[in-house]
Design a protein with these regions (language model features):
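Blade/loop signatures of beta-propeller domains
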Residues: 33-49, 175, 183-185, 335
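A short helix->beta-strand "capping" segment at the edge of beta-propeller domains
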Residues: 37-59, 245-248
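Beta-rich, blade/repeat-based domains predominating
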Residues: 57-72, 85-86, 106-127, 132, ...
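Beta-propeller domains
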Residues: 74-104
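Short loop/turn segments immediately following the C-termini of beta-strands
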Residues: 79-80, 128, 176-178, 226, ...
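A short loop-to-beta-strand structural motif that recurs across blades of beta-propeller domains
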Residues: 87-90, 132-134, 189-192, 230-232, ...
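Short loop/turn segments immediately following beta-strands, especially the blade-tip
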Residues: 234-241, 328-335
């Protein structure tokens, strides 16, 4: 957020997001790697600087940052409260230092959370309060990709949270119960996959799944559970099916606090940047692909998610409750 394996996949495929789309718009097996003793700052990372506040006033609850290379801009969701003002997807232009609202096809609040782009350049979004995964077509129409499990007449999804798209079009998303509707029956919280053919399948049943990301080669899926303070990894085959999950990071073994893993982004070296959405340790915690702790990047407020952007993909954008921060990092990463 790419064709595999020549280019790494991510939440953004780095393919063109059409202007029309913007205008219309289980427990794991095995043991985690031990954390290293050092838990200080992450070498080469700059200080986090707040983006300017929008003229329209304060944001409500920011999530889902997504760098769009074709627009040289970052998108993010203002999730808002279920009964609050209308939710929006915002676009920030780093060159102009200005914001714009990305129009969506529906006038009702959608409370989008996670954002991604598929190989055709279409915007994919989770809708927390509508309980569904949607796609915004180039002509502005909205296509619902998932809303119930295991069938169209089955229980409703809970509150889809984060999403990532592989280069071959496989979509993976987390479904937690944050802000879930109480007037309908719900499926168990889980991680789901929508195949390129549009088939919905359950990847992993998991308590409070949240952040989700892919390895640079698209062969590993990472999923975090914020209430369990754990991050799992799952192997993916050539068709996109997931294998047995293994526990990669256990917050109990990470020194100096790793209690609320929220969003996940990955750099070109395969290192994981996990936002720790916790007042005690407000930071992005960095791990190598084996789960060893590399350090922390301090963020002034509790971070919710992150994305790599800029022309060299070395500018990280981090969402917090009311503010977006930017900082420079030493290694390019996946949007």
């Amino acid at each position: 957020m790419r064709r595999m394996p020549s280019r790494p996949p991510s939440k953004l495929s780095l393919l063109t997001l059409p202007l029309a789309a913007l205008a219309a718009c289980a427990t794991g097996q095995g043991s985690p790697a031990p954390a290293t003793p050092s838990s200080g700052s992450f070498p080469g990372a700059g200080a986090a600087t707040a983006l300017p506040a929008p003229a329209s006033g304060a944001f409500e609850s920011l999530e889902g940052p997504l760098w769009v290379a074709a627009q040289s801009a970052v998108l993010f969701s203002d999730v808002v409260e279920k009964n609050g003002p209308a939710a929006h997807i915002y676009r920030f232009d780093p060159a102009a230092r200005s914001y714009a609202v990305v129009p969506t096809p529906e006038t009702s609040p959608t409370s989008t959370n996670g954002l991604a782009v598929d190989p055709q350049g279409r915007l994919i979004a989770t809708e927390r309060y509508n309980g569904r995964l949607v796609r915004i077509e180039p002509d502005g129409k909205l296509t619902v990709l998932a809303s119930r499990w295991p069938a169209a007449d089955g229980p409703a999804l809970n509150a889809p949270n984060d999403v990532v798209v592989r280069a071959d079009g496989n979509i993976y998303f987390t479904d937690s119960d944050w802000g879930v509707r109480t007037d309908v029956a719900h499926a168990p919280m889980a991680v789901y996959r929508v195949s390129p053919a549009g088939e919905l399948s359950r990847v992993l049943e998991l308590q409070k799944p949240n952040g989700i990301a892919l390895s640079p080669d698209g062969t590993t899926l990472y999923v975090g559970s914020d209430t369990q303070a754990k991050v799992w990894r799952l192997p993916l085959d050539g068709g996109g099916a997931a294998g047995t999950p293994t526990l990669l990071i256990d917050g109990a073994s990470v020194p100096d606090g790793f209690k609320v893993p929220d969003g996940i982004c990955v750099d070109d070296a395969g290192n994981l940047y996990v936002t720790n959405n916790d007042d005690a340790v407000k930071a992005i915690v960095v791990f190598d692909p084996a789960g060893h702790l590399l350090g922390r990047i301090a963020i002034p407020f509790r971070p919710s998610n992150c994305t790599f952007g800029g022309a060299d993909r070395r500018t990280m954008y981090v969402t917090t409750l009311h503010t977006v921060f930017e900082l420079r990092v030493p290694t390019p990463g996946l949007p």
